[in-house]
From Swiss-Prot:
Lineage: Bacteria, Pseudomonadati, Pseudomonadota, Gammaproteobacteria, Alteromonadales
E.C. no: 3.2.2.23, 4.2.99.18
Protein name: Formamidopyrimidine-DNA glycosylase
Binding-site positions, DNA: 90, 109, 151
Biological processes, Gene Ontology terms: base-excision repair
InterPro entries: DNA_glyclase/AP_lyase_DNA-bd, DNA_glyclase_Znf_dom_DNA_BS, Formamido-pyr_DNA_Glyclase, FPG_cat, MutM-like_N-ter, Ribosomal_uS13-like_H2TH, Znf_DNA_glyclase/AP_lyase, Znf_FPG/IleRS
Zinc finger residue extent: FPG-type: 236-270
NCBIfam families: fpg, PRK01103.1
Pfam families registered for this protein in UniProt: Fapy_DNA_glyco (PF01149), H2TH (PF06831), zf-FPG_IleRS (PF06827)
Length: 271
């Protein structure tokens, strides 16, 4: 599933082709995504794209008339192609531009979304209750310590809670907790301030590193020019259950936590 770095890499890749370009058509081949593509989404036709932003794992395409909200779901990707390129299987939507290019949305599993918002996007139900962005100053140790106070849930589940901090999905939660030496099942409210400070720092470093490497490609993700991300080559725990710890050589444990694969080193990561 594309996480924050993958969505940010996509934003960086498509932005130069979209900003200041006028939309000439919106071709919807299959509206049956996670939510049906609304007919109102075609209000973008004739509009000039003013900006392309990211909020959590959502891509926001701004025009004067409103904002297109795109979510890549489990297997979605966006690519810039000549508008005349024949559509292939799972190419569900084309945003056609006056430049002769098109932003093409491909989603084999159809868990993604293509929506339209005329209100300030902060008021949209999908965006209104999101926590701070992890790469901003708003996500800091005092904030996280206060947010976790008295919480009995596992720290990993809290780290993946978009109401607390956005965009830290399963891959990067596993990696950040390993780097910080925190057991993923540790009770969130009992993790001390020193380790929370380390965790915040590691979350920021790991996400920034993943963006620099073009995201993590495990199966479906490619960036806007069709190339894979290379951060998978730097993963220490995610997807490595039963293999040796890169730090101490002990065998990595794998469990299910919140129905998600969770890999950790029982020696390096203490409760």
């Amino acid at each position: 599933m594309p996480e924050l770095p993958e969505v940010e890499v996509t934003r960086q890749g498509v932005s130069p082709y979209l900003i200041d370009n006028t939309v000439t058509d919106l071709i919807v081949r299959n509206p049956s995504l996670r939510w049906p593509v609304p007919e109102i989404a075609k209000q973008i036709i004739g509009q000039t794209i003013r900006n392309v932003r990211r909020r959590a794992k959502y891509l926001l395409i701004d025009t004067d008339a409103g904002t297109t909200i795109v979510h890549l779901g489990m297997s979605g990707s966006l690519r810039i192609l000549p508008a005349t390129t024949p559509a292939e299987k799972h190419d569900h939507i084309d945003l056609v531009l006056a430049s002769g290019k098109a932003l093409r949305f491909n989603d084999p599993r159809r868990f993604g979304a293509w929506l339209w918002c005329e209100l300030p996007e902060q008021a949209h139900p999908l965006l209104s209750k999101l926590g701070p962005e992890p790469l901003t100053d708003a996500f800091n140790a005092p904030y996280l310590l206060e947010s976790l106070a008295n919480k009995k849930k596992a720290i990993k589940l809290c780290l993946m809670d978009n109401h607390i901090v956005v965009g830290v999905g399963n891959i990067y939660a596993n990696e950040a907790l390993f780097a910080a030496g925190i057991h993923p099942q540790a009770e969130a409210g009992k993790v001390d301030a020193e380790r929370i400070e380390i965790l915040v720092s590691e979350v920021k470093q790991i996400l920034a590193g993943a963006i620099k490497q073009g995201g993590t490609t495990l199966k479906d993700f490619t960036n806007a020019d069709g190339k894979p991300g290379y951060f998978a080559q730097k993963l220490h725990v995610y997807g490595r259950g039963g293999k040796t710890c890169t730090q101490c050589g002990h065998m990595l444990s794998e469990i299910k936590l919140g129905q998600r694969a969770t890999v950790f080193c029982s020696l390096c990561q203490q409760r």
